[in-house]
């Protein structure tokens, strides 16, 4: 595990603020008719204007600034010309590289149109997305000094599965810092005793992720782009993520929207 100094955490907080502002801007542009690639282009423009670099473009072989999870895409969706329509959901996952450090965050939203009446499906999607947001918030709350990764994992799993959804097992949160992916892994589920999971120590920076499906937990690689992962049963998938630091005063969200 790569423990950060207070100065390094301050740098990550600066980068995280840039990332949160960019993602907030992107989410404000999400509406029917907007294409995934348009959002990707805007993301790169905004990040560079703020003096940072697109973190995901530093990943070997990946050529975009964001990953998009539209409908049944779970993670790592490559932006395309697909134009969003009412009833879709889209997760935007974005990373920023700033002064030598990465931050990472994601949010999933529904494409709505106030001219249309809400339906039972709308209500189901709203419940699904609210569950993911709550699981992330509650998972972060237990990311305290002296607790373990397993406390985060159990909290996320209990909330997601308690609502009738499934946590994806093959994709997890992670440490983040000078590298986009560092130790430890931070699963959204518990597959061992909490006492056997890594201890949360002061200065640890992690990306807490809630990766879950409305249907079953199984996923498959999709298309031929080598990146996009979808739910195997084509059910909707949600993604919520924040980068946080473990401090003596509690969890510090570095990518606060």
Where are the language model's segments positioned?
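Active-site neighborhoods and metal-handling regions in enzymes and metal-associated proteins
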Residues: 1-257
């Amino acid at each position: 595990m790569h423990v950060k100094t207070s100065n390094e955490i301050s740098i990550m907080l600066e980068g995280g603020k840039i990332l949160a502002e960019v993602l907030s801007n992107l989410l404000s542009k999400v509406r029917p008719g907007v294409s995934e690639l348009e959002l990707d282009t805007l993301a790169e423009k905004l990040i560079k204007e703020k003096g940072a670099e697109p973190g995901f473009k530093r990943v070997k072989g990946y050529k975009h600034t964001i990953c998009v999870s539209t409908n049944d895409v779970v993670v790592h969706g490559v932006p395309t010309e697909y134009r969003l329509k009412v009833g879709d959901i889209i997760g935007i996952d974005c990373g920023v590289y700033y002064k030598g450090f990465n931050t990472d965050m994601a949010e999933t939203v529904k494409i709505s149109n106030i001219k249309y009446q809400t339906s039972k499906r709308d209500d189901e999607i709203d419940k699904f997305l609210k569950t993911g947001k709550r699981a992330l918030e509650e998972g972060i709350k237990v990311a305290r000094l002296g607790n373990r990764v397993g406390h985060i994992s159990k909290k996320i799993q209990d909330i997601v599965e308690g609502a009738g959804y499934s946590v994806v097992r093959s994709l997890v949160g992670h440490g983040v810092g000078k590298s986009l992916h560092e130790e430890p892994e931070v699963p959204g589920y518990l597959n061992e005793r909490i006492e056997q999971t890594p201890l949360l120590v002061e200065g640890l920076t992690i990306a807490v992720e809630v990766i879950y499906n409305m249907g079953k937990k199984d996923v498959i690689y999709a298309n031929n782009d080598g990146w996009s992962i979808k739910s195997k049963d084509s059910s909707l998938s949600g993604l919520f993520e924040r980068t946080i630091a473990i401090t003596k005063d509690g969890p510090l969200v570095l990518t606060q929207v």
